[in-house]
From Swiss-Prot:
Keywords: Oxidoreductase, Pyruvate, Thiamine pyrophosphate. It comes from Acholeplasma laidlawii. It catalyses: N(6)-[(R)-lipoyl]-L-lysyl-[protein] + pyruvate + H(+) = N(6)-[(R)-S(8)-acetyldihydrolipoyl]-L-lysyl-[protein] + CO2. GO terms for molecular function: pyruvate dehydrogenase (acetyl-transferring) activity. This is Pyruvate dehydrogenase E1 component subunit alpha. Heterodimer of an alpha and a beta chain. The keyword Oxidoreductase applies.
Length: 345
């Protein structure tokens, strides 16, 4: 429940202590990184940023249910998924700093570059999952999308394809109640966003997106279903975007109230999960204080390193990390762009 107490022990996943602590520590790192990134941007030290505050459980619960061989086709509000699955905070900061190297994932981390075009992650996920099915690699591809993103055509195209061919896809709608400044009640006439799965003929479920364990259970069931060859599942994580859409807006002065934010703040998932861990004897207030100090030091050190790199990259780097080897078309585009830049100089 909202106080971190297990309501139904039969539904509680039997996760090892190490996994539960990794979930919590990732959430604490993600929350603090969000807060600091907003500060860096306001100080003119970062181009822009899309914070994840309030959506940690929805992201980490899904990520924890994935196997190492599985793929993510991420949206731009996906910090905690990236961190949990092995991407570096340095890469995330580089990306929002404007350095293309931020899109280069560590070796063995099966995460695609961030999708800025809303809805595009659905088609990419469907195609990647279909390739996995054809190659019999036992991989599942997961993607998340915001409530506003479900109004975009590519969301439907990708899921319809995946459903038709039973491609191993798990789709998670992070329903954070706001599509920039449009409330979800004005963006869709559906009682829930989960029920959009009816049209695809696939299983669907609405989950408390602030309950990390509920998100894990729903995601694990969906991953297992996809891995068995039963096709996609649509999960709606009912949650709330505590921060602005990006650093370019100010929600409370434009389109929502402080009272609304305060009500959702009472449901904070990190405090909820912390209480759960303390009740299980896995965590303490002393350890929590130490973690906060370590996390803040890590964030500050990481951003100093990012600033030392700057935003400059070699032109070739933009082209050579799309495929294992550059295709003839990419090589041609690289040479063409190189000549253009030389002409500009």
């Amino acid at each position: 429940d909202q106080n971190g107490k297990v309501v139904n022990e039969k539904m509680e996943p039997k996760l090892p202590k190490e996994t539960l602590l990794k979930m919590y520590k990732t959430a604490v790192l993600g929350r603090n990184a969000d807060i600091k990134a907003l500060q860096y941007q306001r100080q003119g030290r970062m181009l822009t940023y899309a914070p994840n505050m309030g959506q940690e459980a929805a992201q980490i619960g899904m990520a924890a249910a994935m196997e190492p061989q599985d793929w993510n086709s991420p949206m731009y509000r996906e910090l905690n998924t990236l961190l949990y699955r092995g991407d570096k905070l340095e890469n995330v900061f580089l990306y929002w700093y404007g350095n293309e190297r931020g899109s280069i994932k560590p070796e063995g981390v099966k995460i695609l570059p961030t999708n800025i075009i809303i809805g595009s992650q659905s088609n990419i996920a469907a195609g990647l999952a279909m390739a996995s099915k054809i190659r019999k690699t036992n991989e599942v591809t997961a993607f998340t999308i915001g409530d506003g993103g479900t109004a975009h055509g590519e969301f439907y195209e990708g899921l319809n394809f995946a459903a038709s061919f039973k491609a191993p896809v798990v789709a998670v709608i992070q329903n954070n109640q706001w599509a920039i400044s449009t409330p979800v009640r004005k963006a869709s006439n559906s009682e829930t966003l989960a029920q959009k799965g009816v049209a695809f003929g696939i299983p669907y479920i609405q989950v408390d997106g602030n309950d990390m364990l509920a998100m894990y259970v729903a995601s694990k069931e969906a991953m297992d279903r996809a891995r068995k060859g039963d096709g996609p599942t649509l999960i709606e994580a009912f949650t709330y975007r505590m921060g602005p859409h990006t650093t370019s807006d100010d929600p409370c002065s434009i389109y929502r109230t402080k009272e609304e934010e305060n009500e959702w703040a009472k449901k904070d998932q990190i405090a909820r999960f912390k209480t759960y861990l303390i009740n299980k004897g896995y965590w303490s207030e002393e350890e929590d204080k130490k973690l906060e100090e370590e996390v803040l030091a890590e964030i500050n050190d990481t951003f100093k390193k990012v600033e030392s790199y700057g935003a400059n990259v070699e032109l070739i780097e933009i082209f050579e990390h799309t495929y294992a080897e550059m295709t003839p078309q990419l090589k041609e585009q690289y040479e063409e762009h190189k000549k253009y830049l030389e002409g500009v100089k």
